[in-house]
């Protein structure tokens, strides 16, 4: 007996039956459409061949974050509208490139076909010209993602990572001896913080750095805006004509730079840096600071020098001073170990006369210290608590983050160069500083910078939003002995040497209490006490400053400030040490409400030698 069919079997048979019916139907019409099908197949083959040729010449982009189609459209971020002066191009190439060595290949980035053909025509070179392919950066990669305001440096919650910019495709052959890249420059926007512009310059650098052997590699950047000054540096600039910039990069240094994170989204220096750093170029490296129009910073600079030597560093100490610093104070700086270099001040053209920032563009003079290959600049209100010589290993500009996408210029690695100095001067009337000072200006010039841990420029400051545990942590760091911090930066108007040593006088002024820390204050005075005794006299208090301190104390007493520092009796011996012609500071308080400024920046000294109780004023 044959078993009856199951429903499932019926469905299978129905499917098979329908398949046979369809096959017979197709066979009946097959002959009628055979010719038309053949034509369609031939057309498809031809279109496929054309598409393959097109893709071979212009490969598609593959960006995982947000795919960007290369196709028939161009990403507007990468469009470079600069007009190339071909006479300038021909002159530069013939004079500085082709006439000096044998070249095999020329890599071209972001140039269109017409520009490539024109380049071949004007240079009359037998080299292979290779249009190098670079995938566009994903559109969700912004400057803020490359330069975030904050990263988790200690990796408490996450390991910071940078967005990935596509790498350029570098051919094995021919050898690329000249790289040419055309850069966008939209001056209507933030051209100096342009992801595409950065991407193209890094791509050109990678092609140059991929070179093997000892032969020279040149890089030409076509840009109406100045290129990143610390990728291809001023020392490497061979020549410039109009918007054409020709560089001969140091390939070893370039490879080191390309190993760093693309932005400040990751640390360029490990949190636990090596304490013992050897450099073959130590004689060409120095710490540097600057004093202008501010003799009351002399004591701070002397203490900073002491702290550097206590950290174990033997690098040169260079201080730039202007004519407002007296001979007496300069003698103290020399005794502390500073090598003095005089300089002409540079006025900030946007500053109000006699304002605090009128002469702070004088910091640009650091780039004229060309007897050194690298310097670590420090503000004169810093202490170096642990050796930071290892920072000489890192490139310009290495610094801590400040806010938004910006770095703090209080401590930074600088590579002196006359051409970089000239760049700073050439743009002084065009580039606008976000804060009216040198830090804002430098941040507009050096937008590609490298983040170092905040422990290497730790600010003596309590933010309004700091939680109690954060304040406790900072307080512990300020007073740690042996130190945990590398560098402590004494922010605020009342510096430790302008207070009595008994406590931080910022406590007595309500608007300065965010800068008050007795622990940090004690740390500074430990360094002071370690100085040779003959240097202590440069930290004595003027009578006018004593009056200011007493005025502030009385105001705190009237306000019954809860911290209670105004109750502390002063034991600092400097209270009763007088070195001026007029020492009755108490009488100054009779009319102090009428003029309550210490005018520290405008102090003057007599040229006569000081006697034991008549030392010049700070």
From Swiss-Prot:
Purpose: May be involved in the substitutions of the xylan backbone in stem glucuronoxylan.
The EC number(s) this enzyme carries: 2.4.1.-
UniProt binding sites for substrate: 379-381, 408-410, 435-439, 489-495
Listed SUPFAM superfamilies: Nucleotide-diphospho-sugar transferases
Site (Important for catalytic activity) location in chain: 363
Gene encoding the protein: GUX3
Cofactor(s) listed in the protein's UniProt record: Mn(2+)
Sorted UniProt keywords: Cell wall biogenesis/degradation, Glycosyltransferase, Golgi apparatus, Manganese, Membrane, Metal-binding, Signal-anchor, Transferase, Transmembrane, Transmembrane helix
Protein name in the entry: Putative UDP-glucuronate:xylan alpha-glucuronosyltransferase 3
GO biological process: cell wall organization; plant-type secondary cell wall biogenesis; xylan biosynthetic process
UniProt source species: Arabidopsis thaliana
Coiled coil start-end: none
Stated family: Belongs to the glycosyltransferase 8 family. Glycogenin subfamily.
Binding annotation for Mn(2+): 379, 381, 489
Keyword Transmembrane helix: yes
Transmembrane residue ranges: 32-54
Compositionally biased tracts (Low complexity): 598-608
